[in-house]
Every structure is written in C-alpha cells, then in structure tokens.
From Swiss-Prot:
It comes from the Eukaryota. InterPro entries: AP_axis_regulatory_Homeobox (IPR051003), HD (IPR001356), Homeobox_CS (IPR017970), Homeodomain-like_sf (IPR009057), HoxA13_N (IPR022067). Its main location: nucleus. SUPFAM superfamilies: Homeodomain-like. GO terms for cellular component: nucleus. This is Homeobox protein Hox-D13. It comes from Gallus gallus. Residues 1-20, 55-75 are annotated as: Disordered. Residues 8-18 have a biased composition (Gly residues). Keywords: Developmental protein, DNA-binding, Homeobox, Nucleus, Transcription, Transcription regulation.
C-alpha cells in the first residue's frame, strides 16, 4: 500500500502534492476488497468527487480519513470556487452547483416518498425549475435562493415586510429583478383543511367592501346592508281626506285662517286627524288662497 502511495506521489500524480493525492485513498484494509476500493477511488478521482472508503475498521488500522481534496493539474489554472445549494421538488432533493458564468447543474438524489426535511414534506416545496432555464451568474445565486425560500415557516433568512405578501418576480440573467409587495392590511390568515402550510387570506371585515344601495323611489328598503334592516324614511302614501273631514276643516278655515293650540286639538278630535295633519292642512289652504288671489290680479291687469 505504501508503494501505491509512493507511486501516486512520485510520477503518477503529475503536478499535485503527495498529501493531496494520498487523500483519495482510504485507510489500508488488506484483503480482497482492497482492489475494488482502489478502483472506486480511481474512478471517483477521475470524475472530480472524493471517495471515502466504507466498511468497519478494526484494530490499530482504524483511523478517521482526512478531508478529500482535489488534485489540480500542473498546467491547469485553479478553478473558480463552485457555489452550491439544494432545493426540494417533487419526491427528490436536487443539489445545484454553479460556477462563474456556468449554468446550474442538477444532481437528482432519490429520497423516500414520504420524507420530511426541516419539518416540511418535500411535496410542499415550491418549484424553482425556472432558475435552470437560463445561465445565471454565481453572484446572483444567493439572492435567487433567498427569493425562492419565501414559504411560510421556511428558515432561510430573507427580509420580510410585516403586513405584506412577498410576490417575487424572477427574470433572466440580463433582466432586472424586483420584489412586489401586496398590502394585506385588515386581513387575517387561515390554513386550508388539507394541511397545506401556505397562507390564504380572507377579508376580516366583509362589511367594508359592501356598498349601500340607495333607491330613487321613496319608501323603498335599503338593500345589501348586512346585519341591519333599515327602512329608508320617505314620503308616505297620500291618503285623501274624506268629505266630512274636508267640510269640518273648511268651516273652521272660513271662521279663522289661523288656528291656535286649543282649536287645533278640537279639530283633531272631531275629524280623527292628528294635530300635525290639521296644521299642515291650514298651511296648504292659505297657500292655495294666495295663488287664487294672484291669478285674479293677473287677469284683471
């Protein structure tokens, strides 16, 4: 095993350091499984991923593996650090790695159908497939990740404005991005019965949006007024006086065009009318006399 390590550090490693190339090999475990592990380590080194040896180690040979490191070539410049993050879609967990000027690469890792990560079922995470449609620079990934994690109860840090709902608009790499806030003042949230953790808002006071319908006809009922039934006060239907009532009123008017309180009470009792009706009739009768007199003057002139 030391010979293999020496070969990898001497000639086969190229420009890499011995410690870096040695990290691709697991702890020495002698037996038939050594050849398979060496082949798996070589395949992992060729693909760019570190290989960690599996199985139980016993005795003095068991020791923790050092962290895996890449072996860059002698002539190749150092690669830009890849920025990665993960998101949940459907029944799988997708890990995304992104470099400067390179599009998102997705690696679908299978998960149990009813897996729950962070207290939320994976079926309830929002779709961020629109992020992978175009090439996005690496400096925008952190902001895009914050924009994606706008679910209720999600632990990722993002600035939240109280009393507003975050409506995130996602654009391409060359288009500006902005966040739109919809005011939800006076609204209370309620959760759906099927267990969805999103928020749906309904009006707290439904009477604010209702308008009062006013009729142009007198005596109609005001409609669309919740929790109240108010009759609009208007003119009552005109009830003509009887001949006996009119005769009694005309006789009193012939005696005196103006009535006092005692005379009004007496006429009200005799005609079965209210005192207000008697007073109004005398007022209208005086106006009628003035119109008649004015017409006579016009005819004479």
């Amino acid at each position: 095993m030391d010979g293999l390590r020496g070969d990898s550090s001497g000639g086969g490693g190229g420009g890499g350091t011995p410690g870096q190339c040695r990290n691709f090999l697991s702890s020495p475990v002698f037996g038939a499984a050594h050849t398979g592990r060496a082949a798996a380590a070589a395949a992992a080194a060729a693909s760019g991923f570190a290989y960690a040896g599996g199985g139980e180690r016993s005795g003095a040979a068991a020791r923790p593996d050092p962290p895996a490191k890449d072996c860059p070539g002698s002539g190749a410049p150092p690669a830009a650090p890849a920025l990665g993050y993960g998101y949940h879609f459907g029944n799988g967990y997708y890990s995304c790695r992104m470099s400067n000027g390179v599009g998102i690469q997705q690696n679908a890792l299978k998960s149990p159908p009813h897996a729950s990560i962070g207290g939320f079922p994976v079926e309830k995470y929002m779709d961020v497939s629109s992020l992978t449609s175009t090439s996005v620079p690496a400096n925008e990934v952190s902001t895009r990740a914050k924009e994606v994690s706008s679910y209720q109860g999600y632990t990722n840090p993002y600035q939240h404005v109280p009393g507003y709902i975050d409506m995130v608009s996602t654009f391409g790499s060359g288009e500006p991005r902005h966040e739109t806030y919809i005011s939800m003042e006076g609204y209370q949230s309620w959760t759906l019965a099927n267990g969805w953790n999103g928020q749906v808002y309904c009006a707290k006071d439904q009477t604010q949006s209702s308008h009062f319908w006013k009729s142009s006809f007198p005596g109609d009922v005001a409609l669309n007024q919740p929790e109240m039934c108010v009759y609009r006060r208007g003119r009552k239907k005109r009830v003509p006086y009887t001949k006996l009532q009119l005769k009694e009123l005309e006789n009193e008017y012939a005696i005196n065009k103006f009535i006092n309180k005692d005379k009004r009470r007496r006429i009200s009792a005799a005609t079965n009318l209210s005192e207000r009706q008697v007073t109004i009739w005398f007022q209208n009768r005086r106006v009628k006399d003035k119109k008649i007199v004015s017409k006579l003057k016009d005819n004479v002139s």
